[in-house]
Amino acid sequence: RQMCIRDSLHTVDGIHWTAEVDIQIPGNGSVEYSYHIYRDGRTIRTEWNSLPRILHVADNPKKVYRIEDCWKNLPEQQYFYTSAFTESLLAHRERSAAPKSYKKGLLIKAYAPCIDSDHCLALCGNQKALGDWNPDKAALMSDIDFPEWQVEVDAGKISFPLEYKFVLYNKKERRAVAWENNPNRYMADPQIAANETLAVGDRYVYFNLPAWKGSGVAVPVFSLRSEKSFGVGDFGDLKRMIDWAVATNQKAVQILPINDTTMTHTWTDSYPYSSISIYAFHPMYADLKQLGSLKDKKVMAEFNKRQKELNALPAVDYEAVNKTKWEYFHLIFKQEGEKVLASDAFRNFYEANKEWLQPYAVFSYLRDAYKTPNFREWPKYATYDAKEIETLCRPDSADYPHIAIYYYIQFNLHLQLLAATEHARANGVVLKGDIPIGISRNSVEAWKEPHYFNLNGQAGAPPDDFSVNGQNWGLPTYNWDVMEKDGYAWWMKRFHKMAEYFDAYRIDHILGFFRIWEIPMHAVHGLLGQFVPALPMTREEIESYGLAFREDFFLKPYIHEYFLGQIFGPHTDYVKQTFIEPTDTWEIYRMRPEFDTQRKVEAYFAGKTDDDSIWIRDGLYALISDVLFVPDRNNPHEYHPRIGVQHDYIYRALNDWEKAAFNRLYDQYYYHRHNDFWGQQAMKKLPQLTQSTRMLVCGEDLGMIPDCVAWVMNDLRILSLEIQRMPKDPKQEFGHTDWYPYRSVCTISTHDMSTLRGWWEEDFQQTQRYYNTMLGHYGAAPATATPELCEEVVRNHLHSNSILCILSLQDWMSMDGKWRNPNVQEERINIPANPRHYWRWRMHLTLEQLMKAESLNEKIRSMIESTGR
């Protein structure tokens, strides 16, 4: 139980702080406590408290504990203290008892997280109780509060001064295997009185042993295929994927977001990063076999037939799968729902999750009833009212059965994912989730808590290797000022919920916590966006770089006769007659008012999918974005240089002097101006968010990275993402796996990229350079990535210094010609440049076949072992 006493400490010298506290002996025999700094009654600083301080006390009301602690900052190796290690990778499932208490006791505590359950920490020193410097007779320490270790020795039998060291002890072999990497520790006589125990804590222990490194597999849940799945991967399949990870000695399984994305019940809902709830899971991930069989054998036989048909498809048929699964949900709910909803297990789940479960269920019901997820268009309940929602959810309401089915589905999804989580933890595998940076503007959160979001803008990403026009995710941005006022409670709840199922997570687009790329609602592409928050430039500041400010020329699309033919070819005259009009300036045009935004152009071409229409539409998009500066969203008299404009015609229209001035301005704005500012923004949010749970934090730090990102992630011990074909150093074409930082996750490809085999065939000149410079081969590169080449690339990544090497399932399988997919193009999961991409890739063989693919599995096992992972 937590100690609820708050007591002030006092100091005489400004360094050492003391207090005396009288407490009752707690029922469970332990006291939790922590230290905070207060000013004017408010907490202004809290020590690192992911692992609370625990003192196990004797059942003796006269006992005095003298505690010597030091303030705890975030440990340098904080990642080893996360639940990924303490609950899974290096878990101690059978803990020893609390140390025996003595009349005069010396309790020594130390932190040592990198010790597996076959070993323990021990104390060896110049006393008989500590082995008289014989490490094999050292005093074994208790792991009751692992990764903190503790032992109490009888101070009455100690002849001070005390000298000691920590040793690593092998419990099976009953011998010490390593001394700590530290000089002898020394303690003068602390004058311990009768009925007193001196507790000395905050020792950190390090050994000169090889650094822990692990490997893992990344695969979307929807991509899993087993003999039992129903045309899409489910949480039952996730357990089977964990079994494969165990069989190949991998330590992590990484998945994509699994939240409900249902808006239209069409394939466009397949995009996993635009959910309608940050809590609810997608119903399609339910393992129907775990829900039970229908009593109607004829109907059940029909579903079994459909299961085989859908499961035989090479890719996910999103609409057919979800339609069929929902038919099953309705039937099984009618058969089992009343009993399940009356169970104690469900009631406990409901009470713990009611805050999000009830609004989600009502939102889903109203979405289908009103045939739109856009709650602003609902004839009733468009504005969230808790009392009205509560009335709808009453069991005697006519709407209740339509709402309660969502309770039933979410409860079963919770049980199934939790079972997969527990299966992973029991087998020493970390389940790594994915937290999208955004939410959908048509979501439960936008409906229920609109004050947290800026719904008049669109989140996205500036141009990068994934997309030359930037990315427009269409998601609202966060109102961080409002979130800050309640201590980021919205995010805290989100992280706490995720920690129920995951021991590690990837922050999708971690840059969003520094700044987000916000695109105006009238834009389709990402080029017209601006960073938020940002420091826009005044007219005077722009001119201070030597660039005379010309408002009409800099802020309006530059459309000149000479390049229209280059863009539109045979359609040039049609474009002139329909979409643009001449100005008073010779050979200069402007957009007609009915087509002067990208959204207006998009609306005009809606439903037109022929090549000519797309050619003209994309050309018009390019014309509209051909501006030198973008007005600030809050102050139209301040400006942001348009991202990537050096590739456009308006930049070419500048003279050499103007180009040089603009380049100086552009470089200062995008690479220097905001470093401290954005770093401060991130440090307002990320420390308390990343430390609100004990999950291992990994950041997706790809794209246009300001310098402040590296130092913030380093200060907060967040693992970076390293990808060889997207090096952090812009002067390098490829990253060097030997140079990767230890605090990182390395991979060959992400879900937003082509696989290793796909990339090999995209740009043969680049592939040739990689073949010669990075792999060290002479001569011409093969036209395709052979299994031997793929194995070489995989091995290089396994040899990297990164603490985790997590490869896509496709890249693992690329090493075996027998088992890899014969069709390389089928393996790509997402194409970021296409906002309407269909997310439907499925592994081409079943998990049962994968488990029996011994040539591949043995190769993976041996490579992992030989590379020390």
Features from the language model and the residues they span:
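Boundary detector for helix-to-coil junctions that initiate low-complexity/charged tails
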Residues: I67-W71
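Catalytic "initiation/cleavage/transfer" segments centered on a nucleophilic residue
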Residues: K63-Y65
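Catalytic cores of glycan-processing enzymes that make or break glycosidic bonds
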Residues: F80-K103, L107, D154-K157, A188-R869
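Primarily marks secretory-pathway-exposed extracellular/lumenal segments that are disulfide-
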Residues: L74-P75
